[in-house]
Amino acid sequence: MRKMMQREVTYTTAQLARMKMVDGEVTAEVLEPVTLIGNLSVEQAQREINKRSEFKENPAQVVGVEANTQLYELPLDVFLEHATVKERPATKEEVAEVQA
């Protein structure tokens, strides 16, 4: 039996629209939803959208957000194959030992 690694991930789906002038009237062109990492408010999602290069030329307005949390699972051997090893920060006890 393979060991599995699980992780809950929260993401926000932002619904976007782009405002256009058509025959002297302002209309909203609905764009494809964008997925952002984390549980974001409309204001936070708008800031993230404004940072993206594809919206620099033609800005888009966030008209709604929907947060979701899902549980993801990956075999441990696949995780180890793709993961990057990071050094953990020193604990207070380890720092005290070095200073003593």
Curated annotation (Swiss-Prot):
Keyword Transcription regulation set for record: yes
Keywords: DNA condensation, DNA replication, DNA-binding, Early protein, Repressor, Transcription, Transcription regulation, Viral DNA replication
Pfam families with a match to the protein in the record: p6
InterPro entries the UniProt entry points to: Histone-like_p6
A GO BP entry: viral DNA genome replication
Molecular-function GO terms, alphabetical: DNA binding
Disulfide bonds: none
Any coiled-coil regions, as ranges: none
DNA-binding region: 1-19
Its job: Histone-like nucleoprotein that binds to the viral dsDNA and responsible for wrapping and condensing the viral DNA about 4-fold. Forms a nucleoprotein complex in which the DNA adopts a right-handed toroidal conformation winding around a protein core. Binding specificity for the viral genome is based on supercoiling. The formation of the nucleoprotein complex at the genome ends, for which the binding affinity is highest, activates the initiation of viral DNA replication. The binding of p6 would recruit the complex formed by the TP and the DNA polymerase to the origin.
Assembly and binders: Homodimer. Homomultimer. Binds to double-stranded DNA giving rise to multimeric nucleoprotein complexes.
The protein, known as: Double-stranded DNA-binding protein
Native organism taxonomy: Viruses, Duplodnaviria, Heunggongvirae, Uroviricota, Caudoviricetes
